[in-house]
Swiss-Prot record:
Pathway: Secondary metabolite biosynthesis
Name recorded for this polypeptide: Cytochrome P450 monooxygenase aneF
SUPFAM superfamilies: Cytochrome P450
Organism encoding this protein: Aspergillus aculeatus (strain ATCC 16872 / CBS 172.66 / WB 5094)
Its EC number(s): 1.-.-.-
Gene: aneF
Localization per record: Membrane
Similarity remark: Belongs to the cytochrome P450 family.
UniProt: heme binding residues: 437
């Protein structure tokens, strides 16, 4: 009898979700109407293939809106994106998703806008255009040091290196210095000299377990680190590293040292001071650890990944490579002789290459769930009630041929034509609105400096991937599956 009652309840729930639910008017697979198994299948079982799966749904159903879970719609419409992702939006981040990653109170994952605003306005001055311009000499010094060390290892018969590993050493050291006032010395000692990046990779590889089985993750975080690491690999070490950094900042501040040698405070010096004007109070240590976790991830992988995409596509397109190298070598006075970031970022073809690389990489490529406000909204001329979760993936927008013709091709020239302004409006690599990426200016500084130095200095050849295809997975961040390896054929700064 109990089994029969359970069957009736399940059947009733099935019929309600498939036929009577407010979202039943939207197309999608039946399994998505009754459970979260469609998302789980692509995220976990098929390992980060959500983007491929959702793109197939939009094509198969010929609809800009598809149902991917009982109360969750995926939207592929750039105008809806601008409606949702705007300043003072009332489409708030969905707690089930953002609070699951293990750093729920960070500036990127906190869902309450009233808690987010004081935090953002307090740290935002560190990331303004003027503030970032002031970091350009330090950024160039780090890139120059990295390229000098790599060139010194050349035997004269060619020097091959993994682009992503090389760039991550730079971005990690730069970001850690900005955030905490110290580096891991990866540029000097090499990619494998510290466990930090390996544990970050392990955490990202397993991140979906925290979203789809949050109770497992919550249980794991209550255990000793050795056991936590078996359930959520990489997380415990990464958090330990963040604690160590914070403790060092506190110890330094206890000695009265609140500014670095460059005369600027670190990000954590700012976070460790109350700011009554911004209604900001120093949070608990646990919340500070969440901030460290987020900023360390964001500063390490996003720009190194986008720049790796750029290097691959530049070398995979001889005409692009030749035009870029010609522009950069003609500007060696502002790159090699005396680096001038303000002038470098005015270089038109380099700027176009960077925009196209960002379009094709989208460091946060997948769904960014938001909660529909109480008054509801219309999608595809159908009413969607408040409380519904809607997602829009930047990768789908960036691959839309109506916005970017021939989106599969790397075409920097598209950013130099008459449609550049409209395309700029739809460039969403860093998000839009109140919750857009705080580090956009810093990301551009890193990309401009790394690419201008590498291609002004070196003649490079693409060694792998040999099939000239770049493969990646959606693990919230892009996880690179292709190893981009290049060879230095000539060094124009040592001849």
């Amino acid at each position: 009898m109990i089994a029969g009652l359970v069957l009736v309840v399940l059947l009733t729930k099935y019929l309600q979700r498939v036929f009577l639910h407010p979202l039943s008017k939207f197309p999608g697979p039946s399994i998505a109407a009754v459970s979260h198994l469609w998302e789980f299948w692509h995220d976990w079982v098929k390992n980060g293939t959500f983007l491929e799966g959702v793109a197939d749904l939009h094509r198969s159903y010929k609809s800009p809106v598809v149902r991917i879970a009982p109360n969750h719609l995926h939207v592929n419409d750039v105008e809806v994106y601008h409606q949702v992702f705007k300043v003072n939006t009332n489409f708030y981040k969905a707690p089930y998703f953002y609070e699951a990653f293990g750093f729920a109170t960070s500036i990127a994952t906190i869902t309450n806008p009233h808690r987010h605003k004081p935090l953002r306005t307090t740290v935002a001055p560190m990331f303004t255009g003027t503030a970032v311009d002031g970091m350009s000499d330090e950024m160039y010094d780090m890139v120059r040091k990295a390229t000098d060390l790599l060139a010194a290892r050349s035997t004269g018969t060619g020097n091959k290196f993994n682009v992503m590993q090389f760039l991550r050493c730079i971005t990690t050291d730069v970001s850690c210095n900005l955030i905490f006032g110290e580096t891991l010395d990866l540029v000097s000692n090499g990619y494998h000299s510290d466990r930090f990046l390996g544990n970050l990779d392990t955490f990202v590889e397993n991140v979906w377990i925290m979203v789809h089985a949050p109770w497992i993750a919550q249980f794991a975080l209550m255990l000793p680190n050795s056991l936590t690491d078996k359930i959520v690999p990489g997380y415990a070490y990464f958090r330990e590293q963040c604690i160590s950094w914070i403790d060092k900042v506190r110890a330094r501040r206890a000695k009265g040292i609140t500014l670095m040698r460059n005369g600027r405070p670190t990000l954590f010096d700012v976070l460790m001071d109350d700011n009554p004007d911004k209604n900001y109070k120093v949070p608990s240590k646990s919340e500070l650890i969440d901030q460290a976790f987020l900023f360390a991830i964001a500063g390490t992988d996003t720009t190194s990944m986008a720049t790796t995409f750029a290097v691959f596509h530049i070398l995979n397109n001889p005409a692009v490579r030749e035009r870029l190298c010609e522009e950069l070598r003609g500007a060696s006075a502002i790159i090699r002789d005396q680096y001038n970031y303000r002038e470098v970022r005015k270089l038109p073809y380099l700027s176009a290459v960077i925009k196209e690389a960002l379009r094709m990489s989208s460091p946060f490529p997948g769904r960014l769930p938001r909660v529909v406000p109480p008054e509801g909204m219309k999608l595809d001329n159908k009413f969607v009630p408040g409380g519904t979760i809607i997602s829009i993936s930047s990768r789908c927008i960036m691959d839309d041929p109506k916005i970017y013709p021939e989106p599969e091709k790397f075409l920097p020239e598209r950013w130099m034509g008459e449609n550049a302004k409209s395309m700029d409006r739809n460039m969403i690599a860093f998000g839009k609105g109140s919750r857009s990426c705080l580090g956009t200016n810093l990301a551009y500084l890193k990309m401009y400096t790394m690419l201008s130095t590498m291609f002004c200095r070196w003649d490079l050849r693409l060694v792998s991937p040999t099939d000239h295809k770049l493969r990646y997975l959606d693990h919230a961040l892009i996880e690179m599956k292709s190893q981009v390896v290049v060879e230095i054929l000539a060094d124009h700064w040592t001849t």
